[in-house]
């Protein structure tokens, strides 16, 4: 048992509220909240950071640093007032800087002028020179940690005590800091040894670029990728991008500050003699002018880079489309009447699915668990509060960045050349579990939780080992269950869902659809990507069904992850966009001007970045296809985009809640690109990208995956089409670690990663249909295949037809099957007529 925290004499034990009154919260971070406070005795303002401490935190280091920071008294360093420890919370009271951080400021004002940057750099170097003479280093110089007072004074914050506390508490957090301001010797510290205070000088150079370009170099890269590049011996220091915008003196200052060799990098005192920071006219007036630009933006010209792609030609009136609500039986089509007679299983959840359930990703006390393919068992999903965190999955034996260490034969290998992967894959015990002991890697994917496809279609159908006894299932009344506001679920039976009409007479040309549940209201929405923009439909308001425009640009692809909507939308060209769904819906509810003039209608550079609810993903211009996958071995989530002349790979970074660039590959892709799907391979960090399907090389191999190896530094792709017959594939998706569904013409095949059928005595691994399949949805133990005038379901167990709809008077099209199956139908005689929209509703797992 940990000893209780014992404050030193420098940390007051009494109630801090006897001395400070909290006025308002002004910020929050990973380790605590920052408040504007007032000293009740003197009336002086202060900034108070409140941090909750836990047993195990190294409090001796915190005590030592608090003692040291008391000695730092300089006009360019935030003054320390005192600390309190009360009820296991540490209060750190510092000087209040009313102007805010430079990062907050430039989010509103745009780039600082060269003179303003010079003034900030000079003041920063003065503060660092003082710290360095005291034998201290800051270690976290960046725009967010440089503050302005109301009078334009520059103050360094978050050093010493804050740095130590961050390092101490970080031990209990799975958080990777931002390395973009980090010196190369710090990035390579494990390889090359220690570093000294000259790392702060490098950070000043990076911050100078940040203030002029609104972000540090490599900011669009995933942090781990940036660290990797900085630690390489051939890393080149960054420069200012615009050679003509800035003076040669500024360019030279950045070059000297960013001297790669720390032994040749100047000290703070030496750099203060540089012409850039020694020029006349550097006074507080420059900072006061900057603060005035924040407070009175109307008195200053708005910042804009004139990106014509951002200008919206659409009217500013919010676009709403109402359903015609033709509900009488006489107006219903034959297929709609038959819809009521058929019931369907829930869609199968893939083990490689990236999105989180029900928008509950921010609720760590709940896990979601359902068991597919269990005869006689409840097929629905139960939500249970977990008492003990599940164990982490075993760490795969992969290199963080394997390009330099892969043997030559591995660099050029693809799936079709792989040895038997089943022998290398870790053996995972598959059984039904009590919700409180589901491993993380399995919890996030329902297939891995029970008798999934890999067990049904297994090469070893005769079980050789008896499954361990299941723990007693707790009564469902023991667990709270979130309420979802949408179409009501039917009782949890194996065949309990049907297609329900949700919209009549839709005039839009819809390209894709997905679903999302608002984490606060629990309302379920269908989100449509159309030729006229992104629209939403609230399933909790179907009595007055309306589709509301969320974003005004043509959209061809959608995916929701952690309340973030990723879209492939068109400006001048197609590009990946990221949309903050919660903020966009909140904005739509605001009365008055905000509800009609939305932030996405402003050019990106006019709207302050801090308030941008929709942002472009850098380096994705010209993207025309996308796919997302989750690696079930590591939990990492990847997004891959097909560009006109290559591929871009991004990885989801949880602390920043966004996809960040990992790699860019330049090479020609097949045209047309009929297949574009990622396949996760054991012991490979990054997925393979399947861009074509060809005929197998022998009788046992029914298909061959033509792939691009994103793990290789040189030989990325196979000779696509060389000596093999290309197949016209319709659909490829990885259901489980070694289970892939391939749809070809009239056939659906379940194969392993070598393209061989998953043989089984009890289940069919190949299903045939009497029509050319246009799209498929994999249900719990069957496949639902769609064609022009209907759909047909076939069972893996019996190879028999389970459901069938055929209506020659209607043309059907599957719009999306990501968690909710969305279907469209139009009259055959008039394909341009308004459409009806349906969803497969009734299962709890649909919500």
From Swiss-Prot:
SUPFAM superfamilies linked: Protein kinase-like (PK-like)
Annotated positions binding ATP: 26-34, 49
Ranges of residues in domain CNH: 507-820
GO biological process: one example: intracellular signal transduction
EC number: 2.7.11.1
Entry protein name: Mitogen-activated protein kinase kinase kinase kinase 5
Transmembrane regions listed in the UniProt entry: none
Biased composition (Basic and acidic residues): 408-423
Superkingdom classification of source: Eukaryota
Record-annotated active site: 140
Residue numbers bearing the Phosphoserine modification: 335, 433
The family this protein is said to belong to: Belongs to the protein kinase superfamily. STE Ser/Thr protein kinase family. STE20 subfamily.
SMART domains (alphabetical): CNH, S_TKc
Keyword Transferase: yes
Gene3D superfamilies reported in the protein's UniProt record: Transferase(Phosphotransferase) domain 1
Keyword match Heme: no
Single GO MF annotation: protein serine kinase activity
Residue spans of biased composition, Polar residues class: 430-448, 457-467
Signal peptide: none
Main localization, broad class: cytoplasm
Subunit description: Interacts with both SH3 domains of the adapter proteins CRK and CRKL.
Cellular compartment(s): Cytoplasm
Catalytic reaction list: L-seryl-[protein] + ATP = O-phospho-L-seryl-[protein] + ADP + H(+); L-threonyl-[protein] + ATP = O-phospho-L-threonyl-[protein] + ADP + H(+)
Residue span of region Disordered: 378-487
